[in-house]
Every structure is written in C-alpha cells, then in structure tokens.
C-alpha cells in the first residue's frame, strides 16, 4: 500500500486509498485542443518561411552568386601572389646565401693552395686524441671513429649547455662566452693568419704596423658583431671568422677523422633540428616564443630585421614611423621579465634616421638565416678536398658545386615546409658523394697528359 501525506494533514489523521488519491497533486494533462493549436501554429510559421524564401527576387540570388565569385577570385589572387612571392624571394635568398658561402670557400681554398702552414700536419686538436699515423687500415679507421665520437660528444654537450643558458636567460654569460670567442678569432687567429701570409709572400712588416692592423681589424669586428654597424660589414666579418675557424680545423683534424666527422655532424644536425626535443629546435622555438633574435655571433642573416633588435630612438625625432618605433620599443621593455632582458634590449642597434615604410620593413624582414656552423663545415669539406695529397681542382670544384646544389635544395624545402630545417645533411651528403666519386673516377693522370 502506498501512502501520500500533505503537510497540511495531521500526522494522526488516518487516510485510506480514496483520500490519498484525492489529496495527491497530479500534473495537468494536455488536452486535444492544445495539441491542435500548437500544430497549427507550427504549420503557419513554416508556411511563412516558405513564402519568404520563395519571394526572394532573382536580383538577390544574382548578388549572392556574384559575391561568391568575387571571394573565389580574391582567394585565387592571394594564392597566386603568395606563389610569386615565394618564387621571387626564394631565388633572391638562394643568391644571398650562395655569395657568402662561395666567398668563404674561396678564401679557404686560396689559403690552402698558397699558404703551406695550413697543410702541414704538426699537431692535433685535443678533441681528436687518437693518431692516424698507423700502417693498419683497420686501426686507422677505428681511431677516426673514436675521434669522431669524442668530437660529436663535445659539440652535443656545448650545444645543450648553450640552450640551457638561453632557456634560463643567462644572457650575460652567453655574451661573455661569445665575446671571448670572437676576441680570440679576430685578434689571435688573425695575427697567426696574417703572419703566415706575409711569410709566404715574403713581405716584410714591422711589429707596430702589424699590431695596428690587427687592432683596427679586431676592434671594428667586435663592435659590429656585438653592437651595431652596417649589415654588409657584419656579413664580411662573419665570413672571415668562419674561414679562420675552417683553417684551424683543416690543419689540426686528421684526414680520415675529418671525413667521418662530416658525415656524423650531418646526422646530428638532422636530429638536433627536426626532433621535438632537439637542442637546436628548442633554441629556435624559445627565441620565437620570446620574440628575440638569436645572437648575431652564431647566425649569418641575409637581411636586417628592423622590428627586432633595435634600441630606443631619439625622442626629438618626429614622424609616424618614429612614434610607432617608440611604442614597439616600449612594449618590449614592459614585456621583459628580468634584468638580463633589459641588457639585451640596451645592446641593440639604433633606429634608422629616415622614416621606414611598411613595405620597406616587410622587404627587410624577408631574410634567411644560416648558422655559422653550416658555413664552417661546408668549407671544411671543400678545404679538405683541396688539402689532400690526391686532391686536384676537379675534386675541389666538384665538392663546391655539390654543396651549392644541396643548399639550393635545402632552400627549396624551406620554402615548401616553411619551418626551420637542417642545412648540413643534403649539402654534406652531396659533397661527400661528389668528392669520392670524382677523386676515384675523374682523376687526371699527368703522364697521360704529357704523352
């Protein structure tokens, strides 16, 4: 038996089945008339909608078709414009990178062919402790592999260390590290290079003149690389620094170890750039998240990026572009979260004195960046091809052309995928294939020529 009790009823009041049913509140039951009225209302609304849809004039339909066609035309025009820009700037960037890479290789090959100091083997790097002066081919191959493992391990450790410093905003330490490296290259290595060139060509020069030349060369380079100056001057100094580093590698790297290191470094570059947790990829992503440029001592840029890396302009300057410049710089200063960030902003170059239009800024931003490590290993391959006893101009030119072809393909892939790509694998692979095939198949015999 089911009982139902209302609050108004007494607890002692008995109830039977009839009184329980009478006191219970039942929901109202919809009647037939209500359902009929609701259905008529829905039919009337549907009929009005159909009349409204059928009453549209042909002009409205034509206008909608015309607007759709205009949208399609604009989309196709934008796609065509994007393709034209890709072709235009793709070809432009190929030339902008071919020139510095070729200049670096020319400096290295010219030095190797003329200065005997860089082809004499009188020592090895501390990173390649195993000697290759053994009669056994197997032992020599093993030593070259061991040297490669040590060299690649050092590169990996130093790269990870740099990424950790950058991630935790240790900008002062990185600046000091790069300044010290640039100082050694621009002063010490340049002094050695100049001395050997003067000795080779039997040019006498007193020490005060040499010191004055080295001081001017190094001081201007330090100012331009780590502070401000013309873009072309920075590019020239970066090419010279790369060439000096290449000559050191060519002199002190054993022959077999150099070839194995070139193959291994291309594989490491592929992993470091494309893997999600690769150190070079993490470095680039961190720089993009913070909207900061990577240090100029590590990167060769084919164009100046005005919107990144500029200090506060003169407040007395007028004009709309100058005011926009101040607003952008103020936002960057407010977005900095540490004292190290302000140090980065303070070392930036000043704003240009002439007003910069939006077209000029977009034109300048379309630049390609190539790591100096890529410059160095490109030229190491060509320099080693020129420095080997069996190396002639055929193998040297073949290696250089192969590197440029690989660089062109890399830039093509860069335009397709529109993300950071490793620059070493394709070029180094082509260079090694062209070098060894040319050295073994296209070698010229002097006796046959004389006959």
UniProtKB/Swiss-Prot annotation:
It is found in: Endoplasmic reticulum membrane; Golgi apparatus membrane. Belongs to the peptidase A22A family. Keywords: Endoplasmic reticulum, Golgi apparatus, Hydrolase, Membrane, Notch signaling pathway, Protease, Transmembrane, Transmembrane helix. The PAL motif is required for normal active site conformation. GO terms for biological process: amyloid-beta formation; calcium ion homeostasis; intracellular signal transduction; membrane protein ectodomain proteolysis; Notch signaling pathway; protein processing. A motif (PAL) lies at residues 422-424. This is Presenilin-2. Its EC number is 3.4.23.-. The gene is PSEN2. Homodimer. Component of the gamma-secretase complex, a complex composed of a presenilin homodimer (PSEN1 or PSEN2), nicastrin (NCSTN), APH1 (APH1A or APH1B) and PEN2. Such minimal complex is sufficient for secretase activity, although other components may exist. The active site is at residues 269, 374. InterPro entries: Pept_A22A_PS2, Peptidase_A22A, Preselin/SPP, Presenilin_C. Probable catalytic subunit of the gamma-secretase complex, an endoprotease complex that catalyzes the intramembrane cleavage of integral membrane proteins such as Notch receptors and APP (amyloid-beta precursor protein). Requires the other members of the gamma-secretase complex to have a protease activity. May play a role in intracellular signaling and gene expression or in linking chromatin to the nuclear membrane. May function in the cytoplasmic partitioning of proteins. GO terms for cellular component: endoplasmic reticulum membrane; gamma-secretase complex; Golgi membrane. Its main location: endoplasmic reticulum. Residues 335-346 have a biased composition (Polar residues). Residues 1-77, 319-354 are annotated as: Disordered.
